[in-house]
Amino acid sequence: MSHPQRFQRTPLAAALGFALLPLVSSPVHAQLEEVVVTATKQAESLQDVPISVNALSGDSMREQGIMTFDDYVDFLPNVSDAGNAPGMREIYIRGSATEQGSVTVSSAQGSAPGVALYLDETPVSFGGRNLDVYAADLERIEVLSGPQGTLFGASSQAGTVRMITSKPALGEMQGRVDVGMSSTHGGDTSSNVEGMINIPIGDNLAVRAVGYNNRQGGWIDNTASTFTPSGPVIDRNSLGYGPYFRNFPDTVIASVSNQEEVKDDWNEATYTGYRVGVKWDVSDDWSALVQHSSQKLDVEGSFLIDPSLGDDMSAKFQPESNVDEFDLTTLTIEGRVAGLDIVYAGGYLDREIDSLIDYTHYNNGGGYITYYLCSGNIYADPGPSNQNTCFDPRKAYSDTTTNERTTHELRISTDQDRRWRVMGGVYFSDVETKTLGEFQYYSSGDAFSDFQVQYYGAAAQSPYQLANETIPGVAGTNKVGPTGPLTTFYNDYTRTEEEIAFFGQIAFDITDNLTATIGARKYDLETQLQGASNFSFGCRYGGNGGGGADAGFCNSHRFSNSPTDRFLALGGYNNGSISDAQFLGLLNYPGAEQAYGASAKEMFRGGGSNAATLQAIKEGRLDISSINGSGVTEEDDTIIRVSLDWRISDDIMVYGIYSEGYRPAAQNRNAGQLGSNQTGIYEGYVVPAVASTDELENMELGIKTELLNNTLRLNASVYSTEITDLQVARFDPSNVAFLVFLENVGDAETRGLDVDFMWAVTGRLTLSGAASIMDTELTAINKQLQGVAVPKGSELPLAPSFAGNLRARYDFDIMDGNAWVNAALVYRGETVTGIVGSAEFMTDTHNLAYGNEPGVSIQDEGGTFGTVAVSNGSLPSNSRYVNDAATTLNVGMGYARDNWTAEVFVNNVTSEEGYVVQTAGKFTPESSMMRPRTLGLRFGYSF
């Protein structure tokens, strides 16, 4: 198969909106080809779909070197993303951004994403840890802006991204090999190889297989550094918890060097995987497709930099890694019966993630740091030793997460040529996520040793098993046996989500040119969080608290926390099966009374008590209305979508849309806990049991045109979106709780304009571009978040007021082949980071801990942040970090002859840094950044 001339390729390789496709032209003619998409679960021309849809063809992705999640997000003006590294990101569309929790808790305590990610017909969304599918042998990527909930369900709140794989082709032998290599300025080399083969077997059966390996070299250096914990920082974060840091004259504070972890270009990522598909045309009316995809993403090092150190540098004290593997098996059956089209799509996703993250920065924010870090006279009452020592401050987080998802969808539709067109279906999804997250503190064994000798005498042996094992008999836990000697705290959770939904859509041609469409989705959704958080508080507070642990163990289950039983209690009280008196007598887990007697802890301890939680329920400060007697949060609702489209002519269509979207509620593991600080704005504060569903309503007007004899395609849409009860993740150890939790910050709205065009100026020159103008605003702040979140009227994070791109491509004939040159200019405007927290407070922490400024701009949002004072004695401002505007330029030139292609390219010609500050789960700022200037070569052969 020869390399296609420009505009002589398949429709899906045509130029599309948002400048996603490379610029295209043909020496023969300049008309743009039709583009076919399945954004409405029906094959339709892009220009006939009354939705803002963008598509990127497989040919275009290969020509532009678009291979990963980061690559294809970069060229979408109304799309932004944030996160730590490949496989640890979140995507946002049209400014509907929030604040996702840290990756250390996203599996156990994260919000569902607001943008759904699909691989073919299967949803693969995961909050905070997007499934980073390598773009090998894809037919196209479709990006649907605005709520798509009626057809695509939960998490299609702000939009949907669909990755459509190339299917086996019947009756044709095909193959392709692509290789490439590149070098990043100041960094390592990268390489990739991909291969595809399509084999027909008879007339009605075909097999298609693709395999790939892509290694992306690093450019960030982990530099030599020394860390010494700061007493003033520790003291102010201990507010409400203690113990305070007691800096006696003879106190020894250990420092730590990261010399063993110093390495150049240490942020590497390697994608390795394959996909096999078999298609069988059973008859003229029925076909079946089975596919299996498997991938391993292996990330080494950190993709975050410390902006105070300068460009391209981090200072981590532990090795970092993220191994993310998935297997996805899907079955699609299509048929026709009695004039009805029938489609069944089923899938099973099995994903496993193993992560290791440096957690030494927790010394700058944890509420109990002196407890874990120091021994001796750090309390008002001296300990068993007169020595005052703070030990090795290194900390690490180790995580193992498994995610299993089973989906089934059956839909039926009528003939699309009729005046009345109907589609209806049923959808079922069952998701289970298990996570074991171990927080490993190097200091704890030494800090606890004197106390263990006091309680166990000669029988005490070091190192101690600090966190023994999960509370026995608690549903949803997965750990068997003790943890390692450094594990001081760990999460052991199972999250489940089960949904059944019925959906339908009716389209009616009022006239030949005017069509009305109405769709609806009725869903029933059940979510549950089970398991336990396990502490080592028994290692100091009375040894094992009378629990009788064997020598060498110091954990006490009486200090552990069981969300399983918290939600059973809250649900039982909600349905009346638990009385006030019974609620007041609840203990932290079943059997605690038998194990610990009078020393057993109350279930809702922390900053409060069972009585305080009960009072919060009675006063309406703690909503438990959605929790049933089994501890499950139940939601059911119906969302709708209504559109009207008018085809003014064969080349112009205008449309209007009203649509709704949603994402699931989320349970909190510390549900019902009273905040530790009950003064000022925190008076009466209680951790929500459930962060309720946040809902999005969208109104949109759009136009789609093909002008100048189909040489110019111009599409635009203007929209207004309202979000109710926006979910946000929050970590406030100084005032509320040292566990991350979710809550609803308030309401928001976004308004904007999206424009894209493609213009075949001549038979050889093509221009394309896209722009997004957005205005976002928090329109209401819930009472409990006033003075904690940014004030009403503030903009949403990661939402630039302007973003755009412009591309040009020129084709010409030379040496019996086709050559081209292209360029792409991408601009993304200034944004801010976060909704809850104070940039001034984080900067002050950085100054105290490291003795220098973090080097990041701050935007004052007005007022003060309700937390402890900064070092000058005043309350910090309600402020956020600023991400500066960034402009990147990519250029390339290539040549194709017969079955061969070759291209040389330079991406990010000016080495634009494009910093985005990351604050979620952090105590001093870190930033992600763009890959610097990269020069490379690509070669391809197809047959």
Positions of predicted regions on the chain:
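N-terminal periplasmic accessory domains that precede
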Residues: 69, 90-92, 105, 143, ...
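Short acidic/polar hinge/loop motifs at secondary-structure boundaries
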Residues: 105-145, 195
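Transmembrane beta-barrel wall of Gram-negative outer-membrane proteins
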Residues: 185-299, 325-328, 402-408, 413-429, ...
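Structural signature of Gram-negative outer-membrane beta-barrels, strongest in the C-terminal barrel
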Residues: 279-284, 413-415, 425-429, 495-721
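Membrane-embedded beta-barrel scaffold of Gram-negative outer-membrane proteins
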Residues: 332-360, 645-671, 690-744, 749-751, ...
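Outer membrane beta-barrel strand-and-loop segments of large Gram-negative receptors
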Residues: 372, 386-409, 681-692, 698, ...
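C-terminal beta-signal and adjacent terminal beta-strands/loops
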Residues: 439-440, 444-446, 825-849, 886, ...
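Gram-negative outer-membrane beta-barrel transporters
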Residues: 512-516, 711-723, 741-837, 938-942
